[in-house]
């Protein structure tokens, strides 16, 4: 009798694992192939060889790139090279990427930047918020951008128990931000288990010096985050659910879900065109190829443009798709004055004139 019970439990366990495995492949879009959608006036950005996971652009055309991300299970073309922040002036006739110097005293050897966000204060001070993963932990670094010196002055490191696995960030004040946790756990094995079992424990946290609180939860894997030009709505990408969540910002900074836009791809970082409110999205057509890297079958790249997301029928346009022959693993797409920048998790970055 005991053996029968044991065999029954083993069978149930194996069936559950098999079902979860198939579900994970579906969430990763592991069987998806793509056909190219090309743009005519594009070139790879010189000096970016280890990815530009996130990009943020100031109103004056200065673009910041988060480069060199390394993560457990993620491919890297330069595993021993620290990450950094690069800058490009999009108003230049021939813009080029330059690495920003970081103030003395900041640990550059362990700098592992992920999501970034800028904030301009009332006195025109520019703050750069950077999600950092030193030793694969999660911190938020706040820098002051010193334009005359092309440098970053480190102001503060933020750690908090509600920020265990930060992916992206949107600054809403000089020391205030919303952040996505792509996992509930910080331990790599528990993160993998959480993803495999599809627990939907990822969340969004609001941080200020006075208050830190959970403001949205129930995501499969909360990823990119951004805010509408009028600051009324926060957008969150759920990468493994292939969704963008629209949340209304309340006076107390809580978030109330308004709608969910379903997409047929893995949505990563979200960028907002300040003039139109359009959302530009860096996407992964096949997520499995990001983690099981093979040079003959590299991860593809995809850029979507979403117009009128608050309407009953938002317009979703595929702007660019490449099978990985040029650009591998697009994670962000952002626009400035008809100039499109597309960054990747760990490969290169693309500059296009539309």
UniProtKB/Swiss-Prot annotation:
Cysteine-cysteine disulfides: 42-352
Binding-site list for Ca(2+) 1: 53, 167, 223, 268-269
Record note on cofactor: Binds 2 calcium ions per subunit.
Xref: InterPro entries: 6-blade_b-propeller_TolB-like, Arylesterase, Paraoxonase2, Serum_paraoxonase/arylesterase
One protein family per Pfam: Arylesterase
Active-site residues annotated for this sequence: 114 (proton acceptor)
Cofactor(s) needed: Ca(2+)
Domain of life: Eukaryota
An example Gene Ontology CC term for this record: extracellular region
SUPFAM superfamilies tied to this protein: Calcium-dependent phosphotriesterase
Glycan-bearing residues: 254, 269, 323
GO aspect biological process, one term: lactone catabolic process
Post-translational modification: Glycosylated.
Record function comment: Capable of hydrolyzing lactones and a number of aromatic carboxylic acid esters.
Subunit structure: Homotrimer.
Family: Belongs to the paraoxonase family.
Protein name: Serum paraoxonase/arylesterase 2
Gene: Pon2
């Amino acid at each position: 009798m005991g053996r029968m019970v044991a065999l029954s439990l083993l069978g149930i366990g194996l069936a559950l694992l098999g079902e979860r495995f198939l579900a994970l492949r579906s969430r990763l879009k592991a069987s998806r192939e793509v056909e190219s959608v090309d743009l005519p006036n594009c070139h790879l950005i010189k000096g970016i060889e280890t990815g530009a996971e996130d990009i943020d652009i100031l109103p004056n055309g200065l673009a910041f790139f988060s480069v060199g991300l390394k993560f457990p299970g993620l491919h890297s073309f330069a595993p021993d090279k620290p990450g950094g922040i690069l800058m490009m002036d999009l108003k230049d006739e021939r813009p080029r990427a330059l690495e920003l110097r970081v103030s003395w005293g900041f640990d550059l050897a362990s700098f592992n930047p992920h999501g970034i966000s800028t904030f301009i204060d009332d006195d025109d001070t520019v703050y750069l918020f950077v999600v950092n993963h030193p030793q694969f932990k999660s911190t938020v670094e706040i820098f002051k951008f010193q334009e005359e010196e092309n440098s970053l002055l480190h102001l503060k490191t933020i750690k908090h128990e509600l920020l265990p696995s930060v992916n992206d960030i949107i600054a809403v004040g000089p020391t205030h931000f919303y952040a996505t946790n792509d996992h509930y756990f910080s331990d790599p094995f528990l993160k993998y288990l959480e993803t495999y079992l599809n627990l939907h424990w990822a969340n969004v946290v609001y941080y200020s010096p006075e208050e830190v609180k959970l403001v949205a939860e129930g995501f499969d894997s909360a990823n990119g985050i951004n805010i509408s030009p009028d600051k009324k709505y926060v957008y969150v990408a759920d990468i493994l659910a292939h969704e963008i969540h629209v949340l209304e910002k309340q006076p107390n900074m809580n978030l109330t879900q308004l709608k969910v836009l379903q997409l047929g791809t893995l949505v990563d970082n979200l960028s907002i065109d300040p003039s139109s409110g359009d959302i530009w999205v860096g996407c992964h057509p096949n997520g499995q190829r990001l983690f099981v890297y093979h040079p003959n079958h590299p991860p593809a790249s995809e850029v979507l443009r979403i117009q009128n997301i608050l309407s009953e029928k938002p317009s979703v346009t595929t702007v660019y798709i490449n099978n990985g022959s040029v650009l591998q693993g697009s994670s962000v797409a952002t626009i400035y004055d008809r100039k499109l920048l597309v960054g990747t998790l760990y490969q290169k970055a693309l500059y296009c004139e539309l």
